A protein has these predicted regions:
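Phosphate/Mg2+-binding loops and adjacent switch elements
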Residues: 78-192
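Short, well-ordered alpha-helices that flank and scaffold nucleotide-derived cofactor binding pockets
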Residues: 56, 60, 64, 104, ...
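Conserved small/polar residues in nucleotide/adenosyl-binding loops
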Residues: 1-5
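C-terminal accessory "lid"/substrate-recognition subdomains
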Residues: 154-251
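Conserved beta-strand elements of the Class I
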Residues: 70-72, 147, 217-220
Length: 251
């Protein structure tokens, strides 16, 4: 048994407590219909899985049909506790780097309380709200739910927090999404398609970096899964001379 497995085993009692707490939260929570269509882009694991870039692309696509799309984000590491409409010139320490990125692409609201945030979006004329994260939240009614899965990582060790990365059990998640969008797998042959998961789709965006092929680079990143970034550079035959990995949303 490796150290990581040992730690997961020791933390497993806390995962049981987490599971009970989540079920109590689900039982007593009541989703509110705010009167505006809501699409949620979420995941099952703590950390990055590609939700933000998917949300950005989804906004671009749906902007042909909806004139006033708001992205609603929790603003991970943002200091402000009250809902706020974010601009590209907002202080990232107050609203988070994630919210700034969304604001550079369109109307954005940062809110720790999703119900209050959704109401602020509606007050400002939103005719569609895209939630970046919040699949497990029961604050507001979601009209359509997209589960994003990184095929390289999947669901980690399949344990709930804190013994593993899962925010909810895999079985309970099967009834908590409309489509599963698998990223970082261009072959369409993920093992997830054989595990009775419904409505599985694949997403891949190819980026040409021919100019960097065989070039020496210093690689650094501050995302949820830095290993994916480094592996992609290696696949592109880029010579990595030095690597510096920062925590997710590093300032």
């Amino acid at each position: 048994m490796c150290i990581r497995d040992s730690i997961s085993f020791l933390l497993s009692p806390l995962s049981i407590i987490y599971f009970i707490g989540f079920k109590v939260y689900e039982f007593f929570s009541k989703e509110v219909d705010i009167g505006v269509p809501v699409i949620c882009v979420g995941n099952l694991v703590a950390g990055g899985s590609g939700k933000t870039p998917i949300t950005i692309e989804l906004r671009k696509y749906l902007s042909k049909k909806y004139s006033k799309i708001f992205v609603l984000t929790r603003g991970y590491k943002g200091k402000l506790k009250v809902p706020i409409i974010v601009s590209k010139n907002s202080n990232y320490l107050n609203v988070s780097d994630e919210a700034i990125i969304h604001a550079q692409n369109g109307l954005t609201c940062m809110a720790k309380n999703k119900k209050l945030g959704a109401e602020l979006c509606k007050k400002n004329g939103a005719n569609l709200i895209l939630m970046d994260d919040g699949l497990q939240s029961k604050d507001i009614k979601k009209n359509f739910k997209i589960l994003v899965v990184d095929d390289n990582y999947k669901f980690g060790n399949n344990f709930l927090l804190p013994a593993g990365p899962l925010r909810q059990t895999i079985n309970s998640a099967k009834s908590n999404y409309d489509i599963m969008l698998i990223i970082r797998n261009g072959n369409g042959d993920s093992t997830l398609t054989t595990e009775k998961h419904k409505n599985v789709f694949y997403a891949e965006k190819k980026i040409k970096l021919k100019k960097l092929k065989y070039k020496d680079v210093f690689a650094f990143s501050g995302i949820g899964n830095n290993e994916n970034f480094v592996n992609k550079l290696k696949e592109l035959k880029i010579n990595i001379k030095m690597i510096k990995n920062f925590p997710d949303h590093h300032n």
